[in-house]
């Protein structure tokens, strides 16, 4: 989500480009990240000049064509994915404050922006946008003028200490024609090192046409770049160093982060997708706050049935969510395929809450289900990854999954983000209705916050899974078994193989094995089994281990996904894929990832285009 570019060169050099050229082209390179507005600020003739526009970079180009910017060697630019405030010209970046002297662009979410806005308003600051970025820019201006004695680097360090959340900030000031100052925390920022010029970018795509030498910053660091050098400090002012690296891939590959496909990149994006979906949704006391849910609390307390509607992968995310929502809220919860929902005359009323899941927000089947639900008096919450799409506009309220753009047709990171957002909704309802005590909600949120790191641990072990996929590329059929939250994970694992490897695959509830599917088991049949935690409160673990014994006895090749330390599976598994220990309801965020990696490896070994599988489209906009 969002893209940032910064450039500084030398006055009077022989280059045939200026900051405007570098920054706008960098923004184009970052378009794949997804955005809804774009803008640029430059330093020229002792002043800050800027242009910004809702829409694509082409709209910004048109704005600049109408009102040209002067030549400059210093500039910053931004493509915005709306979070605080809608996708409008006013909310677009840069935000220019301090009587036009300071320009700031920002990626991320400032969690304490409301508190800071109140503080600054009391000091006489007026805000024209709805964004957290304008608040951060005004705080930087206040500190620059009152504490830092005109030192932009010091002001950025002190500002970083005041901000909470995830952010990358770039700033230029009319009083400094020789520098850009930037800060980062839990949001990417890379320095591009040139000769007589330097760059900043949210990733190397923003400057790869100009240099292959880059430096990665760590969290809570500030960098000041000039045309000839850069200096890195920590927020406390102490000196720091970055991590230099050479970019080995070309501009086209850079959009994929150096991976061979968007799907592979998006699998690797999943820790950030979950982290960003959680970001900004807790107050300073650790209480869950979903400001986006603009439905009266009395109505939410009166809900007596929840219906989740979705298609494809999103429907499986809904099936996972059902287990959690019913468990936490004690509200009957159904999951319906959106295209079947309105044709069976569902029983809905004003006490029904319909939750619609869609990555694109344009899935026609889901939109039609939502329209039918609202006609029956039900309230609708949309869980969506695309700001400004139709579904959030037609729903009563929306929760955005901040997974960033998902380019590959087969969904990966959106699936985990949808589960995460659905869990937040369930916890919020439980908190609101008094089904869970504050400490219980806090404990569950703590578990959710641990998931990005644990997902990364699964990804770090991907070579074993890739090798397995390559070795099984000639399989004719693969089966998947799971119980409880592992059942929809099994369905999703099968769907991934169907979508991108064109391989027959089926997912089953493991308890159904004796009721028919065991007839499919024959010598050499690969079967994935998602094993629940042995620390669960019921006997599901031992039952699934028995299932493994049954299929192994009939010649199946058993591929077991089990927690670290679960030794009960050792004697019955041909292959074991270990995942970190986690509470039962958190397991799908981990156990899904090996299945994605496996499917991608099988499809790649078969020579298929994993990003654009045959006959499929990313957004299904017809019924």
From Swiss-Prot:
Q: Which residues form the Glutamine amidotransferase type-2 domain?
A: 2-228
Principal localization reads cytoplasm
Q: Where is the signal peptide?
A: none
Q: Which UniProt keywords apply?
A: Aminotransferase, Cytoplasm, Glutamine amidotransferase, Repeat, Transferase
The reactions it catalyses are:
D-fructose 6-phosphate + L-glutamine = D-glucosamine 6-phosphate + L-glutamate
Query: Which Pfam families has this protein been placed in?
Result: GATase_6 (PF13522), SIS (PF01380)
GO cellular component terms, A-Z: cytosol
Q: Which domain of life is it from?
A: Bacteria
Q: Which CDD domains match?
A: GFAT, SIS_GlmS_GlmD_1, SIS_GlmS_GlmD_2
The UniProt record lists the SIS domain at 295-435, 468-613
**What does the record give as the active site?**
2, 618
Example GO molecular function? glutamine-fructose-6-phosphate transaminase (isomerizing) activity
List, in alphabetical order, the GO biological process terms annotated in this UniProt record. Answer: carbohydrate metabolic process; fructose 6-phosphate metabolic process; protein N-linked glycosylation; UDP-N-acetylglucosamine metabolic process
- NCBIfam families on file: glmS (TIGR01135), PRK00331.1 (NF001484)
Write down what this protein is called. Glutamine--fructose-6-phosphate aminotransferase [isomerizing]
Q: Which organism is it from?
A: Corynebacterium glutamicum (strain ATCC 13032 / DSM 20300 / JCM 1318 / BCRC 11384 / CCUG 27702 / LMG 3730 / NBRC 12168 / NCIMB 10025 / NRRL B-2784 / 534)
Q: Which gene encodes it?
A: glmS
